[in-house]
Amino acid sequence: MTVRRRGFMAWTWFITWRFLLVVVLLLLVLLLVLRFVPPPTTSFMLQSAYPVSQHWVSIDELPSHLPLAVVASEDQLFPKHFGIDFTSITKALNQYDDGQGLRGASTITQQTAKNLLLWPGRNLVRKGLEAMLAVSLEAVWGKKRILEVYLNVAEFGKGIYGVEAASRHYFNKSARYLSINEAARLAVLLPSPRSRSPHHLTPYLHQRVAWGEKQMRQLGSGYLKTILN
């Protein structure tokens, strides 16, 4: 019985590892394809309870202050980290251990991985997968592609995905023509896109817009130049 049990366990591990290897290889192939091809949809779009509006736009066609506004608001270390901000994660885990719940500590790369391939919610399993996918995106795509995809798939309202759809919905024009203030107002929607509007900002959100514009000035117009060229 012991020999049979060991044989069964060995066979189980063999099948499991083969399955995981196939999954990893398929994922790498998918990421390689999406490095060059706009994602036709995302897991978040597929799970949306609202009609989806999304229009792809190349990051090269956007004004430089639009990606800067998002980076200033969401992840100022984006050009410097490799997909994961360990300082923010450590702080979030300490808060979790203190009973404050699992708070967001996601980089733009992690948010891209989540929006593209995972599901809503905050738990350690999903956060772990999110972190692993983020490292994969950094290795396969690079910063420019990650930021381009994020700007095109991030949710900005109920069923509104990407800066182009958001700009058309809220400002009746292409994202190519957004002003600095309009870009900052879109950026403040990202943490809670379904409950915020750039036209109905609370005092707190007005403060966040002003803070975002100040951060953009401090970072400088050339802050993302090295990753966008």
Swiss-Prot record:
Gene Ontology BP terms: cell wall organization; peptidoglycan biosynthetic process; regulation of cell shape
Domain of life of the source: Bacteria
EC number from the UniProt entry: 2.4.99.28
Reactions catalysed: [GlcNAc-(1->4)-Mur2Ac(oyl-L-Ala-gamma-D-Glu-L-Lys-D-Ala-D-Ala)](n)-di-trans,octa-cis-undecaprenyl diphosphate + beta-D-GlcNAc-(1->4)-Mur2Ac(oyl-L-Ala-gamma-D-Glu-L-Lys-D-Ala-D-Ala)-di-trans,octa-cis-undecaprenyl diphosphate = [GlcNAc-(1->4)-Mur2Ac(oyl-L-Ala-gamma-D-Glu-L-Lys-D-Ala-D-Ala)](n+1)-di-trans,octa-cis-undecaprenyl diphosphate + di-trans,octa-cis-undecaprenyl diphosphate + H(+)
Cellular component, GO annotation: peptidoglycan-based cell wall; plasma membrane
Keywords annotated in UniProt: Cell inner membrane, Cell membrane, Cell shape, Cell wall biogenesis/degradation, Glycosyltransferase, Membrane, Peptidoglycan synthesis, Transferase, Transmembrane, Transmembrane helix
Gene3D superfamilies: Biosynthetic peptidoglycan transglycosylase-like
Transmembrane segments: 14-34
Major location (coarse): membrane
Protein localization: Cell inner membrane
One function term, GO molecular function aspect: pentosyltransferase activity
Pathway info: Cell wall biogenesis; peptidoglycan biosynthesis
Membrane topology summary: Single-pass membrane protein
Pfam families: Transgly (PF00912)
Function field: Peptidoglycan polymerase that catalyzes glycan chain elongation from lipid-linked precursors.
UniProt family annotation: Belongs to the glycosyltransferase 51 family.
Protein name: Biosynthetic peptidoglycan transglycosylase
Source species: Shewanella denitrificans (strain OS217 / ATCC BAA-1090 / DSM 15013)
